[in-house]
Swiss-Prot record:
The gene is ftsB. Part of a complex composed of FtsB, FtsL and FtsQ. The chain crosses the membrane at residues 4-21. This is Cell division protein FtsB. Essential cell division protein. May link together the upstream cell division proteins, which are predominantly cytoplasmic, with the downstream cell division proteins, which are predominantly periplasmic. The lineage of its organism: Bacteria, Pseudomonadati, Pseudomonadota, Gammaproteobacteria, Chromatiales. NCBIfam families: PRK00888.1 (NF002058). The keyword Cell cycle applies. Residues 1-3 are cytoplasmic. It comes from Alkalilimnicola ehrlichii (strain ATCC BAA-1101 / DSM 17681 / MLHE-1). Residues 22-95 are periplasmic.
């Protein structure tokens, strides 16, 4: 009976060791939990970015002001009847 009890105790200790320190044990589970949390944060950040981009696309599709602003800043366009003045500073004046 003692040998059976000793064998079962040894088996229990071995299984506990696997649970705590083995592959797929609690350390791995903690690491995976941290990884999942980091990925959730990344997904939330990307969702917010997508929402901002979607709002910008909708604004460009429907709003003429945003379209005009982009045309002016990125393409250098001006309205009909406007005069464009570009002021260039001389190096002497820059000091």
């Amino acid at each position: 009976m003692r040998w059976v009890l000793a064998g079962l105790t040894a088996l229990l200790l071995w299984l506990q060791g696997l649970l705590w320190f083995g592959e797929g044990g609690l350390n791995d589970v903690r690491g995976l939990s941290r990884s999942v949390e980091a990925q959730r944060e990344e997904v939330d950040r990307l969702r917010q970015r997508n929402q901002a981009l979607e709002a910008e696309v909708n604004d460009l599709k429907t709003g003429l002001e945003a379209l005009e602003e982009r045309a002016r800043s990125e393409l250098g366009m001006i309205r009909e009847g406007e005069t464009f003045y570009q002021i260039i500073e001389r190096e002497d004046d820059a000091r």
